[in-house]
Structure formats: C-alpha cells, structure tokens
Amino acid sequence: MDNRYFKRDISWLSFNYRVLLEAEDETLPLYERINFISIYSSNLEEFYKIRVADHKAIATGASQSDEETMQSAAELVDEINQEVNRQLEERIRIYEQKILPALRKHHIIFYQSRNVEPFHRDFVRSFFREEIFPYLAPVPVSKDKVISFLRDNRLYLAVRLHLKGAPASSPNRIQYFVMKLPYSKVPRFIQLPKVGKDYYLMFIEDIIKANLDTIFPGYEVDSSYCIKISRDADILIDDAANTSEIIEQVKKKVKKRKIGAVCRFVYDRAMPQDFLDFLVDAYRIDRWELVPGDKHLNMEDLRHLPNPNQSVRPIKKPQPMKLTCLDERESIFRYVEKKDLLLHYPYHSFDHFIHFLYEAVHEPTVREIMVTQYRVAENSTVINTLIAAAQNGKKVTVFVELKARFDEENNLATAEMMKAAGINIIFSIPGLKVHAKVALVLRRDKEGRKLTSYAYISTGNFNEKTATLYADSGLFTCNPVIVNDLHNLFRTLQGKENPVFHRLLVARFNLIPELNRLINHEIELTRQGKQGRIILKMNALQDPAMIDRLYEASQAGVEIDLIVRGICCLIPGQEYSHNIRVTRIVDTFLEHARVWYFGNGGAPKLFLGSPDWMRRNLYRRIEAVTPILDPDLKQELIDMLSIQLSDKRKACFVDDRLRNRWKSSRPQKEKVRSQYSFYEYLREKI
C-alpha cells in the first residue's frame, strides 16, 4: 500500500483504542467507564467478523486472489493480531488496575482468581446446583471426532480431566469436554449476599469452575479455561442479482451467518500450550485464527454489570430538548414554510421528526410521503407512523435497503409489514447500497395544484433508539429546488435514468465533481493571497483520491481541520500535509454527523448529509448531501465545529504514527467538553 496513507484497518484499531482509553478517565461515572470497555470489546468482535474475515478469505485463496494479494492479506492479519494483542495488555491493565479497585472503593467486590470466601461457599454451591447445573450439557471432545459445533460469539468452558484410578499409561486417562455457558438462562454476573457494607459479584464461569467436581464425578479436574469462536458474518450479494434474487440471497445468507467460517478463536492466554494444541487440532483451527484473551472473555457483557450500590454516581446524559417553537400543538409544516429548521440529536428530541410524520398523516392536503430506510428500530415508531399514513389514504413510498449489515432481517420484516399495509416498497438496487437518509412530504390540494412540500435530509438513520445515542444533524426545508432535487432522487430510486440535481449533492452523480470544485476554489483563493479554509467532520476518511486532493490543498497553503471519529487514512504532519490537523472526539454520544465547511473567501459554504469519504460511500452508494442556505443555520453549524475544535477534554489529535495525542493534560473539568458545551449552546437558543 502507498505509504502516503495509513492502512484502513490499523487506523480503525487506533480509533477503537481511543474508545478503550475512556475507561481510564476518572472524571467519568464509574459505570460509564465500564461501559466503554464493553463498547471496545463489541467493536472488536464485529471487526473480526467482517474485516478480518474478509482478509482471511483472501489470504487462504477462498476469494480466488493472486499470490501477491494473498501474501499481503496474510501479513495484514498478522499486523492486526499484533496490535490487538498489544491493546489486550492495555485492556487488562485498565480493568485490573483501574476498574476493579474503583469498584472496591464503592464496596463492590468481584471474586476474580482468588477463592470464594468461606461465608459465600454454601451460597455459591446451592446457587450452582439449583440455577446453573440443570442447563449445563458437557460434550466430549476428541481429535478424531468433533461432536460439538461452537456457535458464534458464545462463551464455552473447555475442561481437561483425569479419570480417577486410570493408570498413567491409559489412553483414556486424559479427557476433554466443552460446555456452553447458559447465560440465556442465567445472568453472566451473579450477585452474592451482601456482607456488612460490601456487595459481591461473580462471573457465572467462575461459579461453574468452582463446582466442576459436581459435573464430573469420577474425574479429577486438571484445568479449565474459557474459549469462544467468532465467525464470518459478512454477506456478499451478487451484483448482477435482480430484486427478487437479492431478497432470496439475503434470506439464505442471513441464516448461514451463524455457521460462517471461523475468523477468530479466542482463548484464555493462561491455557497451557498442550491444552491449546489439542483444541486447535480438534476444531481444525488455523494458527492465525488464534487470538489470546484474558481469563474472562466476552467483555462486551460488562454493559449488563449490576450496580448493587445505589450510592455509586449514576451515568447522567444530557436529556433531549424539545424546541418551544415546535410545541406539539404547533405545526412543523407552518414553521418550516417560514424558515429552514436544523435539529441536532440527541440534544434535540427525535420526537420532532416523529411529529413531522404524524402531521403528514393527518394533514388533508398531503398526498404522498417518501422515505428511505437503512436502519430502523425494532417495533419502530417511524414505521408504525408510515403504516398509519397509508391506512389514512396517503400514498407512501419507502425505499428499503436490504443490504444494511446486521439489519437485513429487521428490514425484511418491516418491509413485509409495510407492504401488507399498502405501502409501496422499493427494494435494493443491484450493485448499490442506498445509504441516504432522506424524507419527502408532497402536498396537493383537491384540484391537484401543487402546494408547499417538505424535504428532510439527515446524517443519521430514522431510528428513535439510536437517536438517543448517536450525535447527528438533520435539516427540514421547503426550498423548492431542494424539494425538487429530492423528488428526482426518489424517482431515480424507482428506476428513472439521467437525473439532474441542482442543489443536492448525490453520490454517483454530482457529489465528486462538486467536492473537487469546492477544494479547487479554496486552493485558488490561497494562490490569490487569501486564506483558504476547509473543515470536514465525518466518521471515516479513506478514499485515496479525495485524500490526495486534501494533500494538494495543504501544499497550496489551505488550512484544513479534519474531525474524524473513526478510520482516517490521511497521514498528518508530513511535508505534503503540514497544514492538516486531525481531531478525534470520543465521548458519551457516538459522533456520527457529516458536516463540511468551505471558507469561500469569507462567505462560507456548509453542507450536511450521509456520506463519509470512503470509496464505498463516494462511488458505490447512493448518498445525499444538502447545502445549508439559511445564514442563522450556517452560523449554528460553524459554532458547532468551532466548539468541537476547542474541545480539550474528549478531543485528541491523531498524529503521524496513529497515536491519540491529548490536546491538553487530563483530567481538567474546566476545559471545553464539546458535547456538553454544544448542548448548553443549543439550550440557550431555545
């Protein structure tokens, strides 16, 4: 790979490591710190199931790659595993030296490797017999015949036993078993009786380990260790498939996801080598699928950790605000007819968008509602409102993206439900994903004359649950050109060819040419002796062509600030990028908005929309970006970007070695914390 770019996957690991570092921040509530370990672990699980699984398929020749590509993929998997192993040491250090002592300060004691205290032994024994033992099903393992299938992302206990009384030379003396932990029946974390001021917790696997003699009478327990398998979860759809074929392929491949190829075998690193060798042979594990872990695996379960001590400082998040100008008795339609409206979630309530749809259901002059669906909540209020609109006589069209990873089943189910209610469903386009987050409400009077219509363009999904967790922005506008552009976009999704977009920037049509024009203009301004300025906020920056344009702008003297949460393949601080700074923000909410600023010689141009600057977004997806035309809303976005660039508590610089460099020494509560500062900024505007 060209050394002018960071490797995508190594850059992502740098981001995930930044997530882990939140667990060290002692200014945060303890259980919020614990939750960041859970997020880190969950992120890593998905990374292996998608990215590493793809590289492994290439490296093993499963994807019919040439020898050089296979070798490159194999080397990358090795590099990934080395970095993950390094991060494991940090995760263990933070958990054991920071989190567990902090829990103890609050009188919450985790039984770890040490034995259970005498005053809890009877409870642990009886709890095991009554609550756990009935759900255990030990399965013997042999090298010659594997009679157990290890399910994806399930925790197993591997046990080595010695048959009592068997001579040392007996081939049956040493036996191996595996057991799936039954925490669909029993919680992962068990609360033990309180003693004095102290609360006690125990992992379910540690309770099982303490009672192996009950499970295996007639055997001496040699040792036991946790293991887990991660399986390839990517779904590849034939680009040439038509709509009905896409539906069938998705249905079949979602079912096969649970039995996908192994991409990671995680094991307790304390396991003896001969024990590990036996399991590797028995389960036909490739050596490079081996990833050592801690004693306790599946640390994403920490999000379910009980908090028995109510005196522990709770996690307090800013509560979503409702704008007084959008009181439920007021019409969003009437407001937007007068002035564009910009909402920022989760600081503003997502109920405003639901209210917008609800008003469309009941407004007699509304004839049609059009929406894209990428990810929606289960039992979605958005979907239920659209169904109500169809039942109320409105024409409703929903584009459903079946290829939204891990949401395929939910999208299929909601599509079938909407179709049964009379909604016109458009399914995935062959060879493309539709990632745009847009909605359009069209009004006509009884005579068919067109009235004002309403467009909504967002950076986030129409999902009321993630709208409380992800930081996104969305624009309501009645601008007739934008409304007409959005109508053309929906026509394109229905098969119309050669659309023309005047204001909207749409990937695969006019987005790349317009981005190049905007960058060229900043370069030209700089050459004229004026100050070129670019600020780009996004989730990921990976496309080499656009990175090269930013390098070119930097070399011309354009000042560039990038606010990139995740993947960033651009290398700052080089001779070709000395005017580029990369800021990464990780805090309570997941930074998800895409907002772009071009200085334009003092008359700034601002945009928001759905795409990151990745190859897939810019060239293989339908994405929508809107200009912000209202001066007040422009200033609001400028202020948001300024606050984020001023963050000294949760923002760091990404340096030329992919290290997360704090902007100031931490912790300092008086420093700007952008998410909370922006919340206060918006609250003052209510």
Predicted features, each with a name:
Residues D274, P544-A545:
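Short alpha-helical
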Residues M546, L550-E552:
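Polyanion-binding catalytic cores of nucleic-acid enzymes and NTP/SAM-utilizing transferases
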Residues E559-I563:
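Hydrophobic alpha/beta core scaffold segments
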